[in-house]
Amino acid sequence: MSTMMQCVLYLAILVVLAIPLGAYIKNVMSGEKTFLSKVLTPCENLIYKVMRVDREEQMTWKKYAVSVMIFSGIGLVFLFLLQLLQGVLPGNPQNLSGVKWDLAFNTSASFITNTNWQAYSGESTLSYLTQALGLTVQNFVSAATGIAVLFALIRGFIKVKSSGLGSFWVDLTRIVVHILLPLNLVISLLLVGGGVIQNLKSAETVSLVEPIAVSAEGEILEDAVIDLDTETVTVDGEIVSDAQIVTEQFVPMGPAASQVAIKQTGTNGGGYMGVNSAHPLENPNAFTNLIEMISILLIPAALCFTFGSAVKNKRQGIAIFMAMFLCLVVALGCIAVTEQAGTSQLAQNGAVNMSMAEQAGGNMEGKETRFGIAASSTWAAFTTAASNGSVNSMHDSYTPLAGMVTMLLMQLGEVIFGGVGCGLYGMLAFAILAVFIAGLMVGRTPEFLGKKIEPYEMKWSVLVCLATPIAILVGSGLAAVVPSVMDSLHNGGAHGFSEMLYTYSSCGGNNGSAFAGFNGNTVFLNVSLGLVMLFARFLPIIGTLAIAGSLAGKKKIATTAGTLSTTNGMFVFLLIVVVLLIGALSFFPALALGPLAEFFGSIA
């Protein structure tokens, strides 16, 4: 099957699964019965009783925001302490020591913000207890927090002259119990059936099928002749005295499948293994790759249809979905085409395989041969369009233009589907901007879903839309003038700048993926990236809730012949233009110094 046909198939499967899931989520959040209600509703009610939650409470937007901040703050402190103390806690068969304070802060900020940036390798840094009780729990609740904030905004559109947006605690409970837990239970079982590990055994050491020789610098010696009896290594007839013979391999174990499932569906992205879903024990074959890849965008895509049903305007949900979907298709096409073509330099270095019957060719540097160009390119587009960040190939090895597209998808504010909940409420902020601009053009008061858009909503919408660019540009600008950051770059020149820009784009966009050549585990980078993640997560949440509170207090306006349609192709086009203009105007100078300079340098 050709690369493009595979990409089309992946997109088709995504749409087919997203529509029914969207209907299910709408029923759950509106309190309607579902096919799982008989089993899950008693569990939900028990949680309310134990935690003394008033399920009828209607919080103001400020109280809702305070609840979100307190809940996230408690999660930050708990996860921080859990990492510091893991060396003296149970569930640590490898006897791993506690994590350094700066890395613990970075990881805590990363996981409570749904970013899941990882400046460490999970299998060699964190205990099973920390992975399960710390990271996996945050994968669930950080995803649920984003969806809860989205539904607060939806209620703002629905309600009339009201100050209540529902209860954060009720929303959080329903999302976890009725949506995330059952969905991830099914996906976990599919992954285990496909070969992803799920156990509590300590790591194992196994014998290699064939020994290898490495130099003193740790590089594999090609064409080496190994004599195990005399323990000597010869290359081209000469003995390499400082070479080491490797006959065993460290194989990590642990509860990977359960964490992989929620890392994908919750757009978290933090891998159980250091190389994420490129690891054969985390993503062993084409079947698990399909499950994990579709899971990335499943809930973000479904929420578009949920939104349309909830506001009783399904065409509006479809319009928002189409704006996101068209951007994704174009981005995926650009990545797939440029990766399939490669570059002349990569061809000279032997990284571009020639097309033949057994394989499709293309830039295979940094990619797994079991996946190839199509699955790797599709995953790259999905994971950066969503604020997921998991990878099955190394983005640092992509061609300059493909790397720029992945970077731009994050820099747009993670609104091309984006994270669960946060992607859609971010896109709705852009929709408010688009409606305001269109209203100015025709000389009418801007309206959206029957509510007037006034200066108060505009100010907060601008803040929501600009939070990501501010976090990325300020963070990367400061890092560029700190001398120690240069030591973290694997490459110099334009590509080195791209590594740094990608890092801050990933953290500022709450994505978490990385150009693997960048070493982010330093005190300055751990602290600065942690602050960027917190800023880019919670400022838009506060802005979204402020907009929701204002809209809920307004009356509905009757639709007239002069009302701007927000469900037709023209509005979809306008929305895409607004998103791209803000992204282009904000980031073009930075992109010109990085991936664009590298691209033009490669063809000069």
Report each predicted region and the residues it spans.
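Hydrophobic alpha-helical transmembrane segments of multi-pass membrane proteins
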Residues: V8-I13, M69-G73, L133-A144, L153, ...
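Long hydrophobic segments that form regular secondary structure
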Residues: F287-I318, F325-L326, S387-K459, F535-A536
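N-terminal alpha-helical transmembrane segments of multi-pass membrane transport
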Residues: M1-N106, F151, I158-S162, G166, ...
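Selective recognition of specific alpha-helical transmembrane segments in multi-pass small-molecule
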Residues: V68-L82, R174-I197, I296-I299, G308, ...
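Hydrophobic, small-residue-rich membrane helices and short re-entrant helix-turn-helix hairpins
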Residues: I158-L181, A302-L326, M441-V462, K555-N568
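C-terminal catalytic subdomain
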Residues: A429-L433, A438-V442, K459-V485, L489-H490, ...
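P-loop potassium selectivity filter motif centered on the GYG triad
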Residues: P90-L135, Q198-I294, A347-C422, M486-F535, ...
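Transmembrane alpha-helical segments in integral membrane proteins
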Residues: V16-A23, G75-F80, L135-V160, I294-N313, ...
